[in-house]
Amino acid sequence: MPGTCGGTTSRCPYILWITRGENVTYVTPLPRCVTEMAQWGSVAGDKVPSCALGGLRHNVHVSGELIDTTEMYLRTIFELEEEGTVPLRARIAERLGQSGPTVSQTVARMERDGLVIVSGDRHLELTDAGRAYATSVMRKHRLAECLLVNVIGLPWEDVHVEACRWEHVMSEAVERRIWELLDQPTTSPYGNPIPGLAELGAAVDESMSAAPALSAVVGRLDASPIRVLIRRIDEPLQTEHDVMAALRRAGATPGSTVKVSRSPGGLLVGSGGEYAEVSLGVADHIAVEPV
């Protein structure tokens, strides 16, 4: 599990550059304590947090930021199930922007590791171990979102992407402390249930409550404006920075009642003087309740 150290570097093909200050000191295989659970990919951009290595702390630089590929895939399958979408390798490729062969190789490794099963019709099923792992990752992700919004004050539209980093490095002790610190939240800032809270001692109903998509509600009505209560924002929409910022400025956040009317570009959504124009595709990922 993450956070355990003292593993050896044997049989690890991953290389990282160890630095002290700004100078490269030496090159070493990535220690097993970092790769125990899954293989790691990289995304160009940021500096990786310091890592315990050989009893010392160093700044670890790869060509970018370490991302746990297995955890990304597990969380994506979990998301698809929440949304009622059949988990297929093609859907994972779309969500993560990866090639078909890359996804197939990763899924094959996950199947070998006992995390998923590829059924006869090619949809992916989480094993008991895979579901427990995916639930843990999503729980950490949504608790990180709560902390980033309620304590750190990160802008709403930036929170999801940042939480995608935190989910891979948060220990169980830290997630438990965050949950207690925030008065035991049960939903994320986007209205999605935090799964697996029973493992932290909660006695709550973690099921996703049924709520139609905004696009479906509007599609059944005439051209007259309607009022709806926003219940939640689906995970795929949370990556759309500009759309999320526009929704926030318009007051169209979970728990808010907004007015919705048709527009040439799709729909106008807002709770006051400012409105956000969203496409019907975006409205597919906004769960609402007519009022």
Q: What is the predicted function of each stretch?
A:
Residues 101:
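Key DNA-contact positions within bacterial/archaeal DNA-binding proteins
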Residues 122-141:
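Basic, amphipathic "hinge/linker" alpha-helix immediately C-terminal to the N-terminal HTH DNA-binding motif
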Residues 168-282:
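Mid-protein regulatory/catalytic core that forms ligand/cofactor-binding pockets
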Residues 43-97:
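Extreme N-terminal segment that seeds HTH/winged-HTH DNA-binding domains in transcriptional regulators
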Residues 107-108:
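Short, hydrophobic-biased segments on the C-terminal half of alpha helices
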Residues 112-119:
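A short, conserved structural fragment
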Residues 2-52, 58-61:
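Short, compositionally biased terminal leader/tail segments enriched in small/polar residues
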